[in-house]
Amino acid sequence: LTCCNQQSSQPKTTTDCADNSCYKKTWKDHRGTRIERGCGCPQVKPGIKLECCKTNECNN
């Protein structure tokens, strides 16, 4: 599975994942909205929005 792994609004980069899912975490801090992308479907703390999906580059 190919997942996107760029941070926030950086140009898209991808990585090959052994997991069968990709994730996208979104939260806000003093710098504004932050986005983290990667492989798998991690646990997140309250207040962080998590989207997981199972197709190539679905977490862009």
UniProtKB/Swiss-Prot annotation:
Please name the PROSITE patterns in this protein's record.
SNAKE_TOXIN (PS00272)
- Which key words tag this protein in UniProt? Acetylcholine receptor inhibiting toxin, Disulfide bond, Ion channel impairing toxin, Neurotoxin, Postsynaptic neurotoxin, Secreted, Toxin
Q: In which tissues is it expressed?
A: Expressed by the venom gland.
Q: Where are the transmembrane segments?
A: none
A Pfam family cross-referenced in the UniProt record is: Toxin_cobra-type
State a single Gene Ontology molecular function: ion channel regulator activity
Source species, domain of life? Eukaryota
- What are the cysteine partners in each disulfide bond? 3-22, 17-39, 41-52, 53-58
| InterPro entries xrefs | Snake_3FTx, Snake_toxin-like_sf, Snake_toxin_con_site, Toxin_cobra-type
Name its cellular compartments. Secreted
**GO cellular component, as recorded:** extracellular region
Write out the similarity annotation: Belongs to the three-finger toxin family. Short-chain subfamily. Type I alpha-neurotoxin sub-subfamily.
Reported function: Binds to muscle nicotinic acetylcholine receptor (nAChR) and inhibit acetylcholine from binding to the receptor, thereby impairing neuromuscular transmission.
Query: Protein name, please?
Result: Short neurotoxin C
Taxonomy of the source species: Eukaryota, Metazoa, Chordata, Craniata, Vertebrata
